[in-house]
Amino acid sequence: ILGLRSGLKLYANVRPIKLYPGVQHKVHGVHQQVWQPDMVDMVMIRENTEGLYHSLLRRMEQKAKGEKDEPIVIEEFPGLEGEVEWDPRPISRKGSERVINFAFDLARHRQRKMGVSQSVTCVDKSNVTRGCRLFRGIFKEISEQNPDIETDAAYIDAFTMWLMRDPEDLDVVVLPNMF
């Protein structure tokens, strides 16, 4: 599947989230109606070909060509003992631009279809990781090119709280591959 994603350029993992009338939610062990179904209608857009999947795609490509997997070797990780495995998590400008532009295009489409304004929320961990800092910076650049769409940004930690507390406030959410 990962090879198909890359080969067919399926870079946007589109995950709609919609509540329907009569479907109860299990909260504190009890099924009940928590949110108004017509108020929760969002779409998560996750980058689908970079990040943690990139090294796996590279290894699959090498195997298909009959080439030997040449892992990047780091002799030690200060502070970690014993066996350690790791995967690089590259995030590119090109990959970020295309998935973020996709999110803005989807928000604009939903705005026309639903007749209500839509927002795009960027979710990342840009306070910690360099790849997410690039992703967030590109989101800010593209936001400025789309003044007709409201924007917000959050670290993944805070976003999980928003998702549970106020799901009706979310429309289109764009995330790097890790989340």
Predicted ranges, named:
Residues 65-157:
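Glycine-rich phosphate/diphosphate-binding loop of Rossmann-like nucleotide-binding domains
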Residues 1-75, 81, 85-89, 178:
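N-terminal glycine-rich phosphate/adenylate-binding segment common to multiple enzyme folds
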Residues 1, 142-143, 148-179:
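Glycine-rich phosphate-binding loop
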Residues 42, 119-120, 171-173:
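Beta-sheet entry/capping signal
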Residues 7-8, 33-38, 113-114, 143-144, ...:
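Solvent-exposed alpha-helices and their adjacent loops that cap or buttress functional pockets
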Residues 58-60, 135-137, 166-167:
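Short, glycine/charged-enriched secondary-structure capping and boundary segments
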Residues 52, 129-131, 160-162:
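Flexible loop/turn segments at secondary-structure boundaries
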